[in-house]
Amino acid sequence: MSDKIKPSEVSQVLLEQLQGINNSQQFDEVGTVLEVGDGVARIYGLRNAEANELLEFENGTMAIVMNLEEDNVGCVLLGSTEGIKEGMVVKRTKRIASIRVNDNMLGRVINPLGQAIDGKGEIDMTGAFEMPLDRKAPCVIYRQPVKEPLQTGIKSVDSMIPIGRGQRELIIGDRQTGKTAIAVDTIINQKSFYEAGKPVYCIYVAIGQKASTVAALVENLKQHGAMPYTIIVAATAADPAAMQYYAPFAGAAIGEYFRDRGYSALVVYDDLSKQAVAYREVSLILRRPSGREAYPGDVFYLHSRLLERAARINDQQEVAEQMNDLPECMKGHVKGGGSLTALPIIETQAGDVSAYIPTNVISITDGQIYLESDLFNQGFRPAVNVGISVSRVGGSAQIKSMKKVAGTLKIDMAQYRELEAFSKFSSDMDAVTAMTIDRGRKNNQLLIQPQYTPMPVGEQVAIIYCGTHGLMHDVPVEKVRECQETFLDKVRTQHADVIEALASGKIDNSLTAVLEQTMADVAGQYKK
């Protein structure tokens, strides 16, 4: 006991221990669940919660704040209600609902939260950008007019209802009329641009579809080599209504990631009718007042704020960098000249385009492609009704050669439909009417195009020139498509330079002379 403990040593040890204490504390703002059911929960105690903020439940389930009331917060669950009960603790994340995006998502199938659901493992999110799901659309000053075409590879669309990069073009029609087919063919047609090093990145948003339908679509895109530049966002029919509601916003956020970095992107919303139904379901459960057809009053604003995010961004770098509502992570990475094109799809009931949601979306978009079940059943596919289909801004984006050869095609087709209807009542026709009907029938056959066979724009110009100039008047109607294939094979092998020139927008007498001579040689074989 000779060694006495010195007070100075004790104080030194205590001092060292005190200095090593980490006194920083983390405070989480928490609330408790009042009630839960039907994919919605009410939380008490989150006085500072923000609209669209992410909340986290004890069991890891995430939710998004939708209703801010005096004494509670209404939120929609992004998962199952299983395991969530009254009194459970919920904490604020202080993050607005967002999705993490990077190039590793290309070729994958994800849910609206950005999680992979294709069974290929997690996506490497190194260097990912945090893109908000809901974001203000670019103001007028940061946009520029639509002037570059988005080639769909579909003759009837590229010639009569052209789509430009940055446009919103609605695809509308009854169920089973080929709406998705037009969107998928457009995605497949971007393969040549991707291989040429000028990619148009595609985002396909599947809302409320069967999982088997989505799997079949992914398989088709794989077979046609379209997955390397495509991302599929899927909220299937088995997912909660909230996931179906947020799926298009996730697709738009991914599209903005490419758009704001100077690339071109295409987003397909298939379909917004189901999103509106999901929003109606969530709103009614949250006891929001309902309006026409029981949809909430702001269902127009739901679609307008989503579709306004499609834009062509100003080429001037210094202007693009000042873009409104730019996410923090995107600052310093913005490049001008990018575009986001939207192809929303709406399903009508018995061809009624005057219903609430169809009229809303028609008034928001820059034109519509109307598909008719009667035409589809007659074998005219894509079943585009030329009379009420229109593109309000795409005409200025058409290449010169296409604009010149297809300028009268839409009027000619509408005139043919009208005359054909009258011809059923009258057997005797004058020569001009008979010729108009004959040419119309042949043009109808030219515009028929099987699914998954998009056509390069140069070939489209060549064959439409032959149709509009009556170069196939000697060919029987039933042989027109066969004649078309023979003609295109001959032009591809013997006059590839002509196709290339037409694709670049050139058209002159020397080029048309080659087309006329080639068609004369081919049509001669079919002369009656």
Question: What positions do the PLM features span?
Answer:
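Walker A/P-loop NTP-binding active-site region of P-loop NTPases
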Residues: 165-216, 271
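Phosphate-interacting basic helix/loop segments used at nucleotide- and nucleic-acid interfaces
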Residues: 13-24, 152-157, 251, 306, ...
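Conserved catalytic/coupling modules of large nucleotide/cofactor-utilizing molecular machines
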Residues: 274, 281-528
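Phosphate-binding/switch loop-helix module in NTP-utilizing enzymes
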Residues: 243-279, 331-332
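Loop/turn-to-beta-strand initiation segments
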Residues: 199-201, 228-231, 262-266, 337-342
